[in-house]
Amino acid sequence: MNIDCPVCTSEGVGETYCVVDDFTYYRCTVCESIFIEPEVIIAMDCGEQLRGYDQNYWKSELRAARQRSRSDGLARAGEAILYARREVRRFLDVGAGPGYLLDQLGLLLPAHADLFHAVEMFPPEEHSSHPNYIIGAAADLQGPFDAGVCIEVIEHLTPAMLTELIKGLALISEADSIWLFNTGMPNYVRHEDPGYLDPRKRGHIISYGVPGLRKLFEHHGFRVSELPGKSFAFIVEYRPTTSLSDFSERFYAPLPANKKLLNTAGLLYLAAFESARSYYFQAQSKQRTEWALALEAELRGQPR
């Protein structure tokens, strides 16, 4: 029996996808999201915890958080700045955990350490001592922020929780503020990491599809854009004033002030630029290959 989707709220569109640790996950045929059984989502919205953010959780996550802060986390932060269509004077890491990324950005860009901020609702006992590390929610902060990242967070959140986060970001954003989200999206789960759905150990309950994300974000003034070739990240912009003809303009023609900021730590600029460019052309190559194969199949089916 098909069930209703908690993400896009379409009725009877959720098909059984898989079972993990005795929890059933469903796939929405409308918004593509993969979500845990709705009873769990309802219980979480009522205050129950499937996987709490206690010290045992952080003990298992701190190593991964530290590794991300020195590698792909830095690349995602650099990309957010590179893609921004407004000058980045204030940057925020949302759901920052222990604040390792904040510390790394401060080390790489010491002359701009005050530019970077982080916020975390459920911090571990040991966390960053940076003065811009704040315990709380995005809505608690004084804006505006020009850019930011939210890395490995929303897969833990119910649609209602994500909506509250979106409302908070809207409060601290201005026109063209950009937020890059790093999360395992449905294509990533299906084709790259089926084990990403992990209710007990990591608390991953939903893989949000882009159509579902658009329904959630657009209501609050955000435009959602896919990142070419990346099945693990997307960007949202608040009340955007620009529309680019092609995504490549974001990395080939960034705002001069933002490129200058990244070039303060040259490797950060290169990491962001090459990540954007390589995945972009990988996506282009895949599309052209699929087109060529489809054309070949069509021609083979035609009588000579």
Language model features by range: what are they?
Residues 181-206, 211-215:
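Short, glycine-/aromatic-enriched active-site segment of Class I SAM-dependent methyltransferases
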Residues 152, 156, 204:
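Histidine-centered divalent metal-coordination motifs
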Residues 175-184, 225:
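A short beta-strand-loop micro-motif that forms or neighbors metal/cofactor-
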Residues 1-151, 163-167, 181, 230-234, ...:
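Conserved N-terminal segment of class I S-adenosyl-L-methionine
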